[in-house]
């Protein structure tokens, strides 16, 4: 329906298969977002879906003589195993040290204008650290740094918080992520991003304070909203301004 109705519009981006997962149970009170029981969604499952949906989108655009639109395709484990199409098997834990041990392959989608989705929340996705004598998180920075040298990526969701959209605000960790997405990676990619979320609910990830929408007070921003507003003011200075954080911490006061 959407591709049929808007095939003549050249400003649409499609995202299919958002955050593929098969989470059956969440019962960790310390990490309410964490899936404690699941059956993994593999790249093969996602690719089968994409190979059915993308031709339908393309058909509508070709019918009106339009160029194929950009289609962002979800990746396994909530859009975090971004290079699953280049690896045999699944590496659990989102870690470069784990994924590097898997054999290489090329199972990329055979369409033009395809990008691969990546989501991050700095409360859980960062450089990794030891907890209680064992590795609790893996080095996602290092992993995505390398992936950006191999695949076109769109960060279609990120927040400044924990993955449930709440909890502390992690300014420094988010700075580091946006620096990486701003060309400071193996492929020198300038990665487009979308922030979660433009809303006025009580979660820490909301850009606006409760009641701001009803009052149409778009300056009533939260800590997260103030940060994103300043980020966009930097990014929107002009297409030649790709320095972002390379020389100074432009995103923080």
Feature names for model-found ranges:
Residues 3-13, 17-191, 200, 206-233:
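Extracellular glycoside hydrolase catalytic/binding regions
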Residues 222-253:
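Aromatic- and carboxylate-lined catalytic core of secreted/periplasmic carbohydrate-active enzymes
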